[in-house]
């Protein structure tokens, strides 16, 4: 990719300025490739928040705005890299890597390593120091980044490829996964300008053993040998030994695919079959050619429906950042997923192959399986355990609010994080943490004892009020502002705030909800337990 000096100088001189104003300067700088320059200035600003490590490296080429919006963040890319490493049996990290991770400017990588070592990302990784030393983690401190001058290979070397990204895009996911795995990897992308940018960027990121291919991902998939053919050609394994060859090291180890979720008119689609390419059609071919397939989908898609439309789905990963659901990942495999929890190696014996659901939100993680979901029932709190109609034996609390002794039985309230809300595993939550929901549709939990490990936000209930005017006045006495949320409630937050005459913010949290007896209440809380 050739960029003239005038354009480079313009980008450096105006990198902190408003691109909307810079767009009017085209006639003043005729030698500058203005569309490209604006993409770089805008892209780098977005990268400071979304991809801080990339933003810190000089010379990274950013794509047009739409591609920057759609690409993964550094945090979610790191999660996928660790997921891929666990599937391929790599070590979570050596002691050296842990030290380097602590030095990194982005601490999310170290948290993800903790998930894996504690089993939240399924199990411990195989301890393999030699493999770990070969890995080049993109979040290491500067002296470990951008030292290699080796350019990405132009050859396909498809017979040696172990990881392929069939829908490369901007290359964020590919770069982190390829770097983490340390195997020969292929990036495939139909758009030539993204391929050109990828070549430049992978060189600056110090990626080795990677191939950039401008082409159609489906055609590239067709070019790979199946595991059966690869083993047959190399070892003479026959068709009757097909079960054994799933454990061979020939052919692809991992396929990553991120199907486009917009139609030709640019409208978002909600069905897996409407995405491009259609993975429901490609799944059998992908599984015949790779040990594992990771499909990245929109969090808007119904994961239950997606699992039904696909075969061999072994894991569902719902990934949130700052309590905002960002990605839905499906792991497919036709091989035995049973793993030795100590060594991370395949024991070759029959294991429980229930679908597992991983709910991730920053440092919070929650894992369950479909059998547990099916057998678990949500416990519903009795209304009289939340607020009593009796007025005798009352006691005073802060700000002269009055509550009944019955409230003391359930003084803690919990709001599940976004990933759990998407997963819908409320019965498992209820049984695992001995917590009860206020009502079937409230998705708010209460408990007698504090549960510090609850995956979500935790609150201490200081009062519960009905909508009786006198009671409202008493319970809200001294409160001028509050953070208000509604759950299974007839009024919107704006309508309720206007009615209560409360400003936004402060340290008080009010949840307006409906109890199991259909009564409407305000649960007044303070953050923390």
Please report, for each region that a protein language model flagged, where it lies by residue.
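SAM-dependent transferase fold signal centered on methyltransferase-like domains
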Residues: 1-529
């Amino acid at each position: 990719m050739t960029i003239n000096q005038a354009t480079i100088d313009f980008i450096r001189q105006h990198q902190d300025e408003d691109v909307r104003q810079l767009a009017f300067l085209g006639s003043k700088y005729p030698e500058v490739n203005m569309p490209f320059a604006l993409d770089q200035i805008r892209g780098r600003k977005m990268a400071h928040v979304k991809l801080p490590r990339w933003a810190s490296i000089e010379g990274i080429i950013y794509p047009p705005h739409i591609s920057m919006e759609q690409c993964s963040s550094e945090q979610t890319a790191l999660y996928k890299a660790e997921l891929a490493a666990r599937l391929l049996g790599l070590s979570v990290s050596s002691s050296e890597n842990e030290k380097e991770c602590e030095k990194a400017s982005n601490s999310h990588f170290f948290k993800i390593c903790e998930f894996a070592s504690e089993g939240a990302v399924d199990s411990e990784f195989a301890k393999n120091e030699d493999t770990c030393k070969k890995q080049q983690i993109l979040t290491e401190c500067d002296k470990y980044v951008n030292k290699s001058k080796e350019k990405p290979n132009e050859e396909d070397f498809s017979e040696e490829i172990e990881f392929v990204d069939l829908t490369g895009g901007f290359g964020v996911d590919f770069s982190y996964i390829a770097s983490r795995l340390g195997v020969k990897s292929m990036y495939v992308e139909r758009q030539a300008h993204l391929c050109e940018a990828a070549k430049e960027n992978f060189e600056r990121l110090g990626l080795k053993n990677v191939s950039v291919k401008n082409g159609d991902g489906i055609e590239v998939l067709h070019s790979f040998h199946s595991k059966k053919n690869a083993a047959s050609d190399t070892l003479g394994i026959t068709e009757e030994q097909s079960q054994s060859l799933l454990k061979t090291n020939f052919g692809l180890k991992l396929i990553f695919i991120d199907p486009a979720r917009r139609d030709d008119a640019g409208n978002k689609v909600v069905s897996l079959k409407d995405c491009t390419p259609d993975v429901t059609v490609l799944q059998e071919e992908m599984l015949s050619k790779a040990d594992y397939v990771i499909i990245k989908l929109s969090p808007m898609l119904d994961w239950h429906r997606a699992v039904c439309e696909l075969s061999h789905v072994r894991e569902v990963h719902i990934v949130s950042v700052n309590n905002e659901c960002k990605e839905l990942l499906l792991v497919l495999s036709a091989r035995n997923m049973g793993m030795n929890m100590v060594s991370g190696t395949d024991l070759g014996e029959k294991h429980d192959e229930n679908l597992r659901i991983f709910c991730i939100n920053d440092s919070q993680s929650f894992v369950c399986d479909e059998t547990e979901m099916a057998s678990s029932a949500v416990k519903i709190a009795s209304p009289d355990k939340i607020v009593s109609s009796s007025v005798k034996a009352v006691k005073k609390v802060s700000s002269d609010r009055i509550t009944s002794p019955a409230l003391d039985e359930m003084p803690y309230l919990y709001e599940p994080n976004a990933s759990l809300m998407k997963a819908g595993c409320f019965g498992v939550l209820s049984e695992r943490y001995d917590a009860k929901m206020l009502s079937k549709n409230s998705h708010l939990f209460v408990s007698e004892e504090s549960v510090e490990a609850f995956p979500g936000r935790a609150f201490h209930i200081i009062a519960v009020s009905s909508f009786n005017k006198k009671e409202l006045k008493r319970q809200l006495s001294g409160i001028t502002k509050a953070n208000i949320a509604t759950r299974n409630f007839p009024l919107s937050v704006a309508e309720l705030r206007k009615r209560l005459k409360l400003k936004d913010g402060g340290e008080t949290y009010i949840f307006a909800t409906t109890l199991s007896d259909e009564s409407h209440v305000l649960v007044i809380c303070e953050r923390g337990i």
